[in-house]
Every structure is written in structure tokens, then in C-alpha cells.
């Protein structure tokens, strides 16, 4: 189990990313446009946005345990929880492979 503070930090980052998404996109467009003076000013504003508002800093975590590695996107849980839940029949439509 991940620490509660790590889970909370990830939730906080997700909120920041959502809050600043439009502003970041607009500033990035200006920076990449061409006019050097305008681009410089936009870059300064972009640097003033919090670091955690950058979507690159988001990391997928298991919804049940908070585990950051072995995450299965389709189900939103870690491989360990997926295996356990699938074995117990808790995930509809998932069964053990046999060939």
C-alpha cells in the first residue's frame, strides 16, 4: 500500500493539471508561434505556472492500493490487484487463459 500522502499528492496534481490545462495550451501555442518578443513574454508566464500543473508530472496509480508500478490502464488497478480480483471473479468478462 502506498502512503496516503502519496495518493493525496497525485490527486492534488491531477486537479492542478485540469485547472491550468487551457492556460498552458494557450501559452505553449504563443511560444511556438514565431514572434520572438511575444514568445519570450509567453515563456515567462509559462514559467510562473506551478510545476505540478504540468501533465508530465502525473503518474498513474492503482485506485485500490496506490501502487505506482504495474498499472493496467484498462482497469485502473495494479497487476497484483488485477490478478487477485480476476481469480476471485470480481472483474466481469475476465477469465484465466487456456489454450
From Swiss-Prot:
Protein keywords: Ribonucleoprotein, Ribosomal protein, RNA-binding, rRNA-binding
Gene3D superfamilies linked to this entry: 1.10.287.1480
GO cellular component, one term: cytoplasm
Lineage: Bacteria, Pseudomonadati, Bacteroidota, Bacteroidia, Bacteroidales
Pfam family, any one: Ribosomal_S14
MF terms in GO: rRNA binding; structural constituent of ribosome
Name the UniProt record assigns to this protein: Small ribosomal subunit protein uS14
GO terms under biological process: translation
Family: Belongs to the universal ribosomal protein uS14 family.
Organism: Phocaeicola vulgatus (strain ATCC 8482 / DSM 1447 / JCM 5826 / CCUG 4940 / NBRC 14291 / NCTC 11154) (Bacteroides vulgatus)
SUPFAM superfamilies reported in the protein's UniProt record: Glucocorticoid receptor-like (DNA-binding domain)
Keyword rRNA-binding: yes
Quaternary context: Part of the 30S ribosomal subunit. Contacts proteins S3 and S10.
Protein task: Binds 16S rRNA, required for the assembly of 30S particles and may also be responsible for determining the conformation of the 16S rRNA at the A site.
NCBIfam families in UniProt: PRK08881.1
InterPro entries: Ribosomal_uS14 (IPR001209), Ribosomal_uS14_bac/plastid (IPR023036), Ribosomal_uS14_CS (IPR018271)
Amino acid at each position: 500500500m502506498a502512503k496516503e500522502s502519496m495518493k493525496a499528492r497525485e490527486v492534488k496534481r491531477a486537479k492542478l493539471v485540469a485547472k491550468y490545462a487551457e492556460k498552458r495550451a494557450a501559452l505553449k501555442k504563443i511560444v511556438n508561434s514565431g514572434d520572438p518578443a511575444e514568445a519570450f513574454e509567453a515563456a515567462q508566464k509559462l514559467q510562473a505556472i506551478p510545476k505540478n500543473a504540468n501533465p508530465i508530472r502525473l503518474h498513474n496509480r492503482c485506485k485500490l492500493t496506490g501502487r505506482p508500478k504495474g498499472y493496467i490502464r484498462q482497469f485502473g488497478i495494479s497487476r497484483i490487484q488485477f490478478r487477485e480480483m480476476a481469480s476471485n471473479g470480481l472483474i466481469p468478462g475476465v477469465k484465466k487463459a487456456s489454450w
